[in-house]
């Protein structure tokens, strides 16, 4: 027996570490078992002379993400704003169009109506989905049986709206529109605060980063917990048949605990042997929920040359031939270590993984030169990347997605305890699931479930609302009267049709009254 404790936490990502910290603060004896040789999970900060520090995994925080902001502040971390001072670029059909604001402007009036209706409809549908129980939405079954591709084919009349919406899905959940359930995706966007909040840098999910990197959140909790965090300990068995739970690792250490928190992506539960076996619904759930595909790429330059052209570094790039769909400036706040971060998303991650690292860098630089209209993009000084698809202890990134039909059938067991095993991980969150924020919410909620089971807190304290961050306040997302009331393209056509019928009828009546109609 390697050790007795109150709680074993499986997984040393942000969710597991947040759970362990809360339990530790309550005076409980906690052991964290982490499969890798580092903590952080899907956050991963590297340090070297070329980059100083760099987040190769989850990195961004913003207003309304109050749990992660509070925890990070408690750990002594500070944030800085991602650069969005200059103009953004929308690159479509080989041309670059500078703009400001969260969404690229649309000049064609019919296309404008279509784009406006697209974002409005997604937000309206999201409002019907309960954040904590998407399967309870009035039209849950209908929406869950539909892919996002099918929904976009229904909503969008113009190719430009459909293309941008497809990029939006790829970017938000690193999956293709035909792979994900419409119900799940609409829930995902809703619980992040809607289409504008999730996509925005300023006043949105990508507003800030941590000085020194997001990996420090888990690292600093590890410093607090000391040797209670065990690295290179993949869990292979969890046995609940005795008085206490026995947790065995790959190197045959056995830990005995009163309770267990599983803080790993749901599908990685398949790497663990359970005794007694998992209940039917949990057993099937974990075989049905994959993670997205993404390669995070960072190209370094001598200086942030794009700023000289009044570009902030954000590029939204459409087209199958473009390896990267979305970029952000990744220069350090003092202006040093100039860099552009870009995502290779979904099927492109699978396709471009066949190339060498140098070949990928070359493709990125050529793309940036074209989009930014600058040969300086062809002279990188350094390049880093991380292919999350090859991580056996993540399974992909950013998060788990739900294919059609899964949320309504299996969603309700996501957070359901199995005996003395409780479930954390960003996937189980109800606000900013898929983000570091969701990881903290879920970890702390699972910890409080155990505290309640131990009689240390009342049931009504398991779920807690988080006060707004003083340092990173949220501005409300507003829409104009026109945006709320403009017709969709079909609505406009119906209006034109009705107007034509009404006009023809009125003319007929007038002609009849004046005796202009000749009877044959």
Swiss-Prot record:
Modification type N-acetylserine: residues: 2
Alphabetized GO MF terms: monoamine oxidase activity; primary methylamine oxidase activity
Keywords: Acetylation, FAD, Flavoprotein, Membrane, Mitochondrion, Mitochondrion outer membrane, Oxidoreductase, Transmembrane, Transmembrane helix
GO CC terms: mitochondrial outer membrane; mitochondrion
Subcellular location: Mitochondrion outer membrane
Bilayer disposition of the protein: Single-pass type IV membrane protein
Reaction it catalyzes: a secondary aliphatic amine + O2 + H2O = a primary amine + an aldehyde + H2O2; (R)-adrenaline + O2 + H2O = (R)-3,4-dihydroxymandelaldehyde + methylamine + H2O2; a primary methyl amine + O2 + H2O = an aldehyde + H2O2 + NH4(+); benzylamine + O2 + H2O = benzaldehyde + H2O2 + NH4(+)
SUPFAM superfamilies reported for this sequence: FAD-linked reductases, C-terminal domain, FAD/NAD(P)-binding domain
Pfam families listed in its UniProt record: Amino_oxidase
Transmembrane segments: 490-516
Keyword Ion transport: no
EC number: 1.4.3.21, 1.4.3.4
Residue numbers on the Mitochondrial intermembrane membrane side: 517-520
Site residues, Important for catalytic activity: 156, 365, 382
Cytoplasmic face residues: 2-489
Requisite cofactors: FAD
Top EC class of this enzyme: oxidoreductase
N6-acetyllysine sites (modified residues): 52
Residues bearing the modification S-8alpha-FAD cysteine: 397
Role description: Catalyzes the oxidative deamination of primary and some secondary amines such as neurotransmitters, and exogenous amines including the tertiary amine, neurotoxin 1-methyl-4-phenyl-1,2,3,6-tetrahydropyridine (MPTP), with concomitant reduction of oxygen to hydrogen peroxide and participates in the metabolism of neuroactive and vasoactive amines in the central nervous system and peripheral tissues. Preferentially degrades benzylamine and phenylethylamine.
Assembly notes: Monomer, homo- or heterodimer (containing two subunits of similar size). Each subunit contains a covalently bound flavin. Enzymatically active as monomer.
Annotated family: Belongs to the flavin monoamine oxidase family.
Record protein name field: Amine oxidase [flavin-containing] B
Lineage: Eukaryota, Metazoa, Chordata, Craniata, Vertebrata
Name of the encoding gene: MAOB
């Amino acid at each position: 027996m390697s050790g007795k404790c109150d709680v074993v936490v499986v997984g040393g990502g942000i969710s597991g570490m947040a759970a362990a910290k809360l339990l530790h603060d309550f005076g409980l004896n906690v052991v964290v078992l982490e499969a890798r040789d580092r903590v952080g999970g899907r956050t991963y900060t590297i340090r070297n002379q070329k980059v100083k520090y760099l987040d190769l995994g989850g990195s961004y925080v913003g207003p309304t993400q109050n749990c992660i902001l509070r925890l990070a502040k408690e750990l002594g971390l500070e944030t800085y704003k991602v650069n969005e001072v200059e103009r953004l670029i929308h690159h479509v059909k080989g041309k670059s169009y500078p703009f400001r604001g969260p969404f690229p402007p649309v000049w064609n009036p019919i296309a404008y109506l279509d784009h406006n209706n697209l974002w409005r409809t997604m937000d309206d549908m999201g409002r019907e989905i309960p954040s904590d129980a998407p399967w309870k939405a009035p039209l849950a079954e209908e929406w869950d049986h539909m892919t996002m591709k099918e929904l976009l084919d229904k909503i969008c009349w113009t190719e430009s709206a459909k293309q941008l919406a497809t990029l939006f899905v790829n970017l938000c959940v690193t999956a293709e529109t035909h792979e994900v359930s419409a119900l799940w995706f609409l829930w995902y966007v809703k619980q992040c605060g809607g289409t504008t909040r999730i996509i925005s840098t300023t006043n949105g999910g990508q507003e800030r980063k941590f000085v020194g990197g997001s990996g420090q959140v888990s690292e600093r909790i590890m410093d607090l917990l000391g040797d209670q965090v065990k690295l290179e300990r993949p869990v292979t068995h969890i046995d609940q048949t005795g008085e206490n739970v026995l947790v065995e690792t790959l190197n045959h250490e056995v830990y005995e605990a009163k309770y267990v928190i599983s803080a790993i992506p749901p599908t990685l539960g398949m790497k663990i042997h359970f005794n007694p076996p998992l209940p039917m619904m949990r057993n099937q759930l974990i075989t049905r929920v994959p993670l997205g595909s993404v390669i995070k790429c960072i190209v370094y330059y001598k200086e942030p040359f794009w700023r000289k052209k009044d570009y902030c570094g954000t590029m939204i790039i459409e087209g199958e031939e473009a390896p990267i769909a979305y970029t952000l400036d990744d220069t350090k706040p003092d202006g040093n270590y100039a860099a552009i971060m870009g995502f290779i998303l979904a099927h492109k991650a699978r396709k471009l993984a066949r190339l060498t690292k140098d070949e990928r860098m070359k493709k990125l630089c050529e793309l940036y030169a074209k989009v930014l209209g600058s040969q300086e993009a062809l002279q990188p000084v350094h390049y880093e990347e991380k292919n999350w698809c090859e991580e056996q202890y993540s399974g992909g990134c950013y998060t788990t997605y739900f294919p059609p039909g899964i949320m309504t059938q299996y969603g309700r067991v996501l957070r359901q305890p199995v005996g003395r095993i409780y479930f954390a991980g960003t996937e189980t969150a109800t606000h900013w699931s898929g983000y570091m924020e969701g990881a903290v919410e879920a970890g702390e909620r699972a910890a409080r479930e155990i505290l309640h089971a131990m009689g240390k807190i009342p049931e009504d304290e398991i779920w807690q609302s988080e006060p707004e961050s003083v340092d990173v306040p949220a501005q409300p997302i507003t829409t104009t009267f026109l945006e709320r009331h403009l017709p969709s393209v079909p609505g406009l056509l119906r209006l034109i049709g009705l107007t034509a019928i009404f006009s023809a009828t009125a003319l007929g009546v007038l002609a009849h009254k004046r005796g202009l109609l000749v009877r044959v």
